[in-house]
A protein has these predicted regions:
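Catalytic or ion-coupling anion/metal-binding cores of large enzyme and transporter domains
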Residues: 1-76, 80, 89-108, 120-121, ...
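Glycine-/small-residue-enriched capping loops at alpha/beta junctions
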Residues: 83
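Acidic/charged coordination and interface sites in well-structured regions
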Residues: 86
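N-terminal small/polar loop signature for handling phosphorylated ligands or for N-terminal nucleophile
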Residues: 105-143
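Contiguous domain-boundary segments centered on the initiation and propagation of an alpha-helix
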Residues: 129-136, 141-148, 458-466, 471
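A short, small-residue-rich loop immediately preceding and capping a beta-strand
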Residues: 140-161, 172-176
């Protein structure tokens, strides 16, 4: 199928924009790879230190068996990462069977936004991505590994690991998922209880019972937020094995897929005939495919910020216009909560990513001719994994959706576009996701209420101060102000106001993830207020027009452009809960439109 003209045009634009940086990157990883397998160049003393604790130290010192390094984000506080506790032993056995040796190269931190929502710790969340990249870099700096396995699932973890994999782009990389937890209390019922609690209609006991019934076992949360968007992304970009993203933890199929991933990691090293450095996988076509998947599934807006940072590590320069243009061409094919009632388990059962990839390829909406760890182009990702004894056999996936209330073909989508819009105006540049927003709320013109943090919004709500249509402006939430925390805890409050018949919207230089749903939210506004950006000039009562249809965001006050910006006071977010240690990160973080990066 001929590539869609818009996808072709955006890819060419990215390629041209990235010509110099990508060329420099490819030369860098070629230099790193040219002297062959890494550990052969270590001195005997260096090697003895590296192998001292290993049972197979003789193999490591005297043979040419590939040595696989594991970079793991295991902890048992994150339900999505708890299954990784068992993975190193399984990977060692699989590696030995495949003629390789295996070492845990190092661990990286992994924090849960679901735990830190609305708390001071959330101000460390975005920067944890860069810490993860740095920690993975330290793990790989021993220069002992012929390929690397990356164990990570959730919000900042996968982007941080991809940044590291790209930086060590001469080392082949395989990402190993852990899978979503089985379905619990339906997400829409959980959301309803949250809104009832916010409105004072139920007590904390009912809220706690609903939350525990929803988040109830090992595995990723089942709504389609950033964590599950990450898993989709790794499959669409060819870093997972086909059909592996949404298989539940602790099942025979999950274990067999992990074994198969180890076998691929052993097969694609420079020691064999199928050398596949990570940097060759992570090209402009792979990133375009990732954006296509984000739009077709209605994925998290956090990836609009993470993908530019990930791409930059591989010498590829993305802009939010790329997301906008791809969104305009790629239809919304899935309804997964918060865009629908289904969860990721239902999506997977309906045909999942394999069906979707097949449809997009047939329509020319994604690149087929890419390098993947599967050893094929993207057509190999239309297959489904099946157990054949204890091993994996891939067979042709369904060419028909198995539930058209959850998953639809390109020819009959839920919406013509992916629902992500670029916003531009005198308030700056940002994005809005409208796939779950009712059409009558795509344009809102209302007076502004100005807040400097989300707790102020909740206090005003409890005081009954919202009695008319309102644009809620929460500023000083950018990366240089306070680390750009997730503002998802505002969702129940704003949803209650909307359900009362008010037109409300959020405008912020902070984040509001893809789990946020039906309230219009203009997010990632840049330049951010703390650097003198336009949001710092907005006043209470100003008329603001948010027009997702035209892609504009403007303050209509006549004197707006001549006002002096309000100064940012960092006192409330400069210390406590480790925030003082991240002052250096806040000082140098890039703009959200470029990924809010520190190390890239």
């Amino acid at each position: 199928m001929t590539l869609h003209s818009s996808i072709d045009r955006v890819t060419d634009r990215i390629r041209e924009r990235s010509r110099n940086t990508r060329d420099s990157y490819l030369k860098k990883i070629a230099r790193a790879a040219e002297d062959g397998p890494r550990r052969a160049h270590l001195s005997c003393g260096n090697q003895a230190h590296a192998y001292a604790a290993m049972d197979d130290k003789d193999d490591m010192a005297t043979t040419r068996k590939p040595n696989i390094g594991i970079v793991t984000a295991y902890n048992d506080m994150l339900s999505a990462h708890q299954p990784y506790e068992r993975f190193p032993d399984l990977i060692r056995r699989a590696g030995h069977a495949a003629g390789a040796t295996v070492q845990v190269a190092g661990g990286v931190p992994a924090m849960c936004d679901g735990v830190t929502q609305g708390r001071p710790g959330m101000e460390l969340s975005l920067f944890s991505r860069d810490v993860i990249a740095l920690a993975a870099g330290v793990a790989l700096s021993h220069d002992c590994f012929d390929s690397a396995l990356y164990l990570g699932v959730c919000d900042k973890i996968v982007p941080g690991l991809v940044i590291a994999a790209a930086t060590f782009g001469h080392v082949p990389a395989v990402f190993i998922p852990a899978g979503p937890m089985p379905s619990g209390l339906p997400n829409d019922e959980k959301s309803k209880v949250r809104q009832q609690f916010a409105a004072g209609e139920v007590g904390r006991d009912a809220l706690m019972a609903a939350e525990m019934a929803s988040y109830h076992s090992p595995g990723t949360c089942t709504f389609y937020g950033t964590a599950n968007s990450n898993q989709m992304l790794m499959e669409f970009m060819g870093l997972h094995l086909p059909g592996s993203s949404f298989v539940n933890p602790n099942t025979p199929l999950r274990e067999a897929l992990t074994v198969a991933g180890v076998e691929r990691a052993a097969a694609i090293t420079r020691l064999g005939n199928d050398y596949l450095p990570a940097g060759d996988v992570l090209d402009e076509k792979a990133f375009v495919n990732g954006i296509v998947g984000l739009m077709a599934t209605g994925g998290s807006t956090n990836l609009v910020m993470h993908l530019p940072a990930m791409a930059r590590a591989a010498g590829v320069l993305l802009d939010i216009e790329d997301f906008h243009d791809i969104s305009e061409s790629v239809p919304l094919m899935a309804r997964v909560y918060p865009n629908g009632l289904a969860d990721v388990n239902h999506f997977h059962a309906a045909g999942g990513l394999g069906y979707m990839i097949g449809q997009l390829l047939e329509a020319g909406l994604m690149h087929q001719d890419v390098k993947t760890i599967n050893g094929t182009g993207m057509d190999g990702y239309t297959a489904e994994p099946r157990l054949d004894g204890e091993r994996i056999r891939w067979e042709a996936g369904s060419t028909d959706t198995l539930n058209d209330r959850i998953l639809r073909p390109v020819s009959d989508p839920f919406a013509r576009t992916g629902g992500l819009k670029q916003l531009d105006g005198n308030l700056g540049r940002g994005v809005i996701k409208i796939s779950a927003v009712a059409e009558e709320r795509h344009v809102i013109e209302a007076k502004a209420r100005i807040f400097s943090d989300q707790e102020q919004v909740k206090t005003a709500f409890r005081a009954g101060e919202f009695t008319e249509d309102t644009i809620v402006v929460v500023r000083f939430q950018g990366p240089r102000a306070n680390g750009m925390p997730e503002l998802h805890s505002l969702t129940p409050t704003l949803a209650v106001l909307q359900d009362r018949g008010l037109k409300v919207a959020l405008v912020t230089d902070g984040r509001m993830s893809g789990a946020s749903g039906k309230v219009p939210a203009a997010i990632h506004i840049s330049p951010e207020a703390s650097t003198g950006g336009p949001l710092a000039r907005v006043r209470d009562g100003d008329l603001i027009r948010l027009d997702a249809t035209m892609g504009t965001i403007d303050c209509l006050a006549e004197d707006f452009d001549t006002r002096k910006p309000v100064a940012f006071d960092p006192a409330s977010s400069s210390e406590g809960m480790g925030r003082e240690m991240f002052a250096a990160f806040r000082a140098v973080a890039g703009p959200a439109t470029e990924g809010a990066g520190v190390v890239v």
